[in-house]
Amino acid sequence: MLAAVKENLRITSTALDDDLQGDIDAALMDLQRVGIDTSDQSQPLIIKAVKLYCRWQQDYMNKGEQYCKAYTGLMQALSLAGDYIAESQD
């Protein structure tokens, strides 16, 4: 996932790898917080959500607010989609 996020942000250096990995982890935790199953991180919409979150956190091209809105919208849509809802651990 780190490589995909770096490519999406047009970053080739390894200097920000720790920060970006932290953003990736935070995005996945945020998705889980609203009940989204992130166990299959090869799902295109999960990857897209993580990329949007990272663009928001990095204020990519000074458009962080736009990426925040896009991430929030996708997160809300995924939380309502049956295919992405995590199964209860009852």
Regions found by a protein language model. Give the residues of each.
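Divalent metal-cofactor coordination and adjacent catalytic microenvironments
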Residues: 1-90
